[in-house]
């Protein structure tokens, strides 16, 4: 069983591509594709779930488990935020990754919300116990962009791990908690009202609002990531350029397609890091 979330742009077509690719590879499966009910009442979502998963499923029981799932999503995002902000400064390379895999194992074994809360507490305690030497003023970089490209490690060629390996503190506003569970489009646009008036598509408002927030918080830079041809994020780029000029914060733009090379990405990230390090040294 695969679950595909929907989207108002090409995100809604990802499920069709995944279905086609996996069937060409010989897999047999049922796909729960929410793109088929985008914008429809909750009842339609429930009907699709019952038809695909279990016609006899209890709706109240399903709601309880869905709420537990939402709790797990929030916990995973909280743990990931801590990991991104601190993993670059571990004394023993690999400690954070080892702790994170143990945390994921605990979450996979969780059977109810109580188990999820216990796994979260144990996981964060494990993270905080890792010996670190974090400088008082580390290089801080925010990550923004198109949902799947900016978040998925395979899609962005491991940008997060590359930057953590350079000793960079990372922040990522774009996650399921902020984009799906607690999303408020009007508040986001209001927070960046000097730069945007209207919603330009899927994650555009969050991209712009997050970039402005990072600039106002004194971040050293922001990296914008998108799949090649993603129109909403292309529309964001001139706005980000304005923010970059106004706030004196560099914003490199990474566009991914089938020809994007790992070596080329390394070169760009290393040059970006060197520039930030020299700028920070100059400001001391």
Predicted segment positions?
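An N-terminal assembly and electron-transfer interface module characteristic of large anaerobic redox
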Residues: 1-284
């Amino acid at each position: 069983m695969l679950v595909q979330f929907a989207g108002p742009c090409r995100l809604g077509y990802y499920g069709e591509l995944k279905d086609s690719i996996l069937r060409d590879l010989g897999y047999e499966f049922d796909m729960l594709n929410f793109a088929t009910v985008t914008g429809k009442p909750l009842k339609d979502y429930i009907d699709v779930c019952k038809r695909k998963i279990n016609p006899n499923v209890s709706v109240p029981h399903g709601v309880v488990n869905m709420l537990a799932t939402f709790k797990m999503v929030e916990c995973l995002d909280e743990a990931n935020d801590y990991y991104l902000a601190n993993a670059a400064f571990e004394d023993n390379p690999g400690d954070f990754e080892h702790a994170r895999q143990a945390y994921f194992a605990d979450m996979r074994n969780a059977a109810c919300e109580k188990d999820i809360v216990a796994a979260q507490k144990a996981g964060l305690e494990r993270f905080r116990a890792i010996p670190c030497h974090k400088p008082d003023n580390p290089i801080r970089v925010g990550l923004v962009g198109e949902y799947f490209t900016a978040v998925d490690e395979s899609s962005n060629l491991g940008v997060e791990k590359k930057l953590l390996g350079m000793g960079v503190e990372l922040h990522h506003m774009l996650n399921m908690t902020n984009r799906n569970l607690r999303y408020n489009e009007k508040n986001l646009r209001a927070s960046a009202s000097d730069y945007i008036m209207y919603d330009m598509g899927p994650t555009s408002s969050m991209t712009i609002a997050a970039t402005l927030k990072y600039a106002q918080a004194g971040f050293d830079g922001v990296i914008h990531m998108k799949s090649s041809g993603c129109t909403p994020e292309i529309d964001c780029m001139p706005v980000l350029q304005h923010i970059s000029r106004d706030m004196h914060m560099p914003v490199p733009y990474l566009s991914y397609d089938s020809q994007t090379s790992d070596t080329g990405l390394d070169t760009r990230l290393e040059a970006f890091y060197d520039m930030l390090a020299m700028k920070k040294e100059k400001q001391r």
